[in-house]
Amino acid sequence: MKLIRFLAVLLCTGLLCGCEMSSLPVGNESAEPPEAVSVDMSFAENTSDMFTDRDHETEFDTKDCVHIQLSGDTASSDSSAVDIEGSIITLTQDTSYYVTGKLNNGTIVVNPPDTAKLQIIFDGVEIHSETSAAFYILSGDKVFLTLAEGSENHLSSGKSFVSADDTNIDGTIFSKQDLTINGEGKLTVESPAGHGIVSKDDLVLTGGIYQITAASHGLSANDSIRISGSTLTVIAGKDGIQADNDEDTEKGFVYLESGTYDIKAQGDGISASNYLQIIGGDYKITAGGGAGASASSESMKGLKASGSMALSGGTFYIDSADDGVHSNTSIVVSGGEFTLSTGDDGFHAD
């Protein structure tokens, strides 16, 4: 076990990259200057396009919304923009929806036109789905899920998932499109058989309080995960936060800006198949059971990026069975405070 305390604000910029250690010169022996290392950090230069203005928009007027009242085994609505078949509630139009109530064993399916950018407000929603996602986004250009201020919302799934058509649904919240979750409410997600929140495109969080418990990944996305100003507590059987895309080299990244993150993951705390960028925030991460856990073939790192990593500010408490901070290429640290307890390296870059 290694315990490392590192105050990065003492550095203007710290660059870690893999290298071999050669013998040091002694006496008057001259030494060749080290070879310059070129690192592509262009991804960190402009972050203004990480969030759109609408990602942060949380206002709504219930008078302008389609109302849906969940009630036990079914729901009710007086709008033709909602199809109700037993416990399957389908939202079909490009409009705003206001949802309240409890659904015992069913699913809200979002299936509007492909160009739709619709807002769905949860205000005291509780949904359990025994064999599918509790909230399933099938179509649309982008969906904005707003947690009403002061509301508590609870989504859960059962012990197995059944595929829908050709879709392998494996999360309590499952989106085939871009998904933004915002607002000032609370969302609890329980997934005993899969992931907590899944997006096959971008997953964006710009506010809210999240309590996520999942047998697999807590948050998972193909294209990117972008989070700002949110409070997350994640307990995951695999990675806490994971973006993974092996088809497009520009995707599969994680961007975190401010917020509070408490992650207990049996795999990696935060993992990106591309780059990982963090600007501020408070992070408490336990990966793989912590530094005292037995070694495993599974990756159990605190922060991991297959591409480059840029850390600028923030407070990090990382307890990991493997490396605390790991990149397959390079790590740039330009601020932050780190307390690392690791079973392997504190900082490691290949």
Predicted regions and their residues:
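A composition-driven surface/loop motif
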Residues: 5-15, 19-350
